[in-house]
């Protein structure tokens, strides 16, 4: 890392700082970290809620998919998906980030509408909701799954 920094130092300043910053950020590796998604998945398993898939090949790339119950779960990061409670636009390059986040929100709506039209129950959680009360989120999802099981069972009769 030090070698990279010295190479980019020109007259006491960094040349091409954004490219260097990007390269340095890619080099950072998390250690002993658990993502919000991993914590939620573990909480589901601990609650006895299994038979879900991650990385399902569905439109919109839901974070968790329950094929039998026709339930898809999106765990939206507050920054990337423009949370109305705690999402924010960075102070630098504001127009880029505002456009980017608005596009993300529009894409989310379009993809979820398609999933809804295909008969999926859509469950959405904001990152801050999971951090504030994970067990509540798990209980709500358990209730939705149970309701869908009853609905599916009534069609089978």
Regions of interest found by a model, annotated:
Residues 1-157:
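Nucleic-acid endo/exonuclease domains
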């Amino acid at each position: 890392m030090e070698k990279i920094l010295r190479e980019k130092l020109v007259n006491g300043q960094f040349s091409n700082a954004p490219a260097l910053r990007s390269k340095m950020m890619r080099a950072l590796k998390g250690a002993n970290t658990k993502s919000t998604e991993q914590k939620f998945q573990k909480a589901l398993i601990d609650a006895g809620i299994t038979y879900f898939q991650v990385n399902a090949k569905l439109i919109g790339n839901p974070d968790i998919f329950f094929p039998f119950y026709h339930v898809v779960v999106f765990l939206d990061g507050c920054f990337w998906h423009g949370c109305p409670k705690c999402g924010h636009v960075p102070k630098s390059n504001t127009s880029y980030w505002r456009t980017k986040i608005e596009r993300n929100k529009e894409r989310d709506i379009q993809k979820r509408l398609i999933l809804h039209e295909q008969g999926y129950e859509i469950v959405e959680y904001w990152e801050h909701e999971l951090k504030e009360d994970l067990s509540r989120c798990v209980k709500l999802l358990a209730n939705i799954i149970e309701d869908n099981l009853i609905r599916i069972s009534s069609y089978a009769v």
